[in-house]
Amino acid sequence: MQTSPLLTQLMEALRCLPGVGPKSAQRMAFTLLQRDRSGGMRLAQTLTRAMSEIGHCADCRTFTEQEVCNICSNPRRKENGQICVVESPADIYAIEQTGQFSGRYFVLMGHLSPLDGIGPDDIGLDRLEQRLAEEKITEVILATNPTVEGEATANYIAELCAQYDVEASRIAHGVPVGGELEMVDGTTLSHSLAGRHKIRF
């Protein structure tokens, strides 16, 4: 079926979103045009503004429309002395929702991957090293993903922290709450056993 060129362009543009295939893009385009043109206009305007105005925080590299994000500019966060290193801005949102961390962050925007030509400077480790040298950081919490690349990245950063006498710790990976042991993979179970803690009464 031949569609209008502009409609085809709209569907192709929507396919840049993760998980959106041809059918989903078609459904989204038709929904916006048939039922929610005002919503479509609002989406277009907000998307245009976001693409032109949102950049990276000068300190932690997360997304923000300011030079320094709200977390990094918070005096209480600075006094905490902890920096949590994550792979993406989405990880910050996940950790913030727990309400268990009151320090600042550093976003790598990826991980080390020599096979893909991604080295330390490509993920901002030169900037992290500068912060280790200049700021009063007491602990770096490594919250990279539990993948081969994530572990390699965490180990590299831990060695970097040691050069500046800054404590480095790795977040625990283990059995999910409500999970059954027989369904957990061996690597996760190994991490759980290694990271066990004593029960005190």
Swiss-Prot record:
Keyword field contains Cell membrane: no
Domain Toprim: residue ranges: 81-176
Alphabetized UniProt keyword annotations: DNA damage, DNA recombination, DNA repair, Metal-binding, Zinc, Zinc-finger
Chain's role: May play a role in DNA repair. It seems to be involved in an RecBC-independent recombinational process of DNA repair. It may act with RecF and RecO.
One of the GO BP terms on file: DNA repair
GO MF annotations, alphabetized: DNA binding; zinc ion binding
Organism from which the protein derives: Escherichia coli O6:K15:H31 (strain 536 / UPEC)
InterPro entries (UniProt xref): DNA_Rcmb_RecR, Rcmb_RecR, Rcmb_RecR_Znf, TOPRIM_dom, TOPRIM_RecR
Pfam families: RecR_C (PF21175), RecR_HhH (PF21176), RecR_ZnF (PF02132), Toprim_4 (PF13662)
Gene that specifies this protein: recR
Family, per entry: Belongs to the RecR family.
Protein name: Recombination protein RecR
NCBIfam families: recR (TIGR00615)
Zinc fingers (C4-type) by residue: 57-72
